[in-house]
């Protein structure tokens, strides 16, 4: 997968001149949306099928600061999938002559229908289910 590139905007920085911590969750979402498009399962397609994928947990480890105009490469991968819960992993690296990993994190998701019930992925979305299982298996191998 091609990493998602985010350029830090001035409004994302705080009084100390560094990227405010809350913006990293937004960057994760931007990268996840791009990742899903690269997989051929954009969120718009899932919503057309009546499937939503809410975030149920987020975990971040800040390793180094970023500042205005930094470019951050965000590598996204499927960390785990058990047929119900999907864990997405993120590694953010500040680009430049000496790239620096600035954040590692995870977000956990489930798949729900319009009534808020769990989607039976294996039965209702078998191609997507298989893709996620393969990607999770590759991560754990």
Regions found by a protein language model. Give the residues of each.
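HotDog/MaoC-like acyl-thioester-processing domains
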Residues: 2-4, 37, 67-68, 79-141
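Glycine-rich, flexible loop/turn motifs
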Residues: 6, 12-14, 42, 51, ...
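Hydrophobic beta-strand-centered segment that forms part of the acyl-chain substrate-binding groove
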Residues: 35-80, 85-86, 100-104
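Catalytic strand-loop segment that frames the active site of acyl-thioester-processing enzymes
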Residues: 1-35
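Generic structural detector for well-ordered beta-strands
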Residues: 5-9, 61, 110
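Anionic, Ser/Thr-rich low-complexity intrinsically disordered regions
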Residues: 12, 16-21, 29, 46, ...
């Amino acid at each position: 997968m091609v990493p998602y590139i985010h350029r830090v905007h001035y409004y994302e920085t705080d009084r100390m001149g560094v990227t405010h911590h809350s913006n990293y969750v937004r960057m994760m979402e931007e990268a996840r949306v791009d990742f899903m498009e690269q997989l051929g399962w954009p969120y718009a397609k899932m919503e057309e099928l009546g499937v939503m994928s809410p975030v149920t947990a987020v975990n971040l480890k800040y390793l180094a600061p970023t500042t205005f105009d930094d470019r951050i490469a965000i590598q996204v991968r499927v960390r785990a999938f058990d047929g119900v819960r999907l864990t997405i992993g993120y590694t953010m690296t500040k680009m430049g002559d000496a790239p620096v990993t600035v954040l590692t994190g995870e977000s956990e998701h489930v798949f729900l229908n319009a009534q808020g019930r769990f989607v039976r992925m294996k039965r209702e979305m078998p191609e997507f289910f298989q893709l996620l299982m393969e990607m999770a298996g590759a991560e754990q191998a």
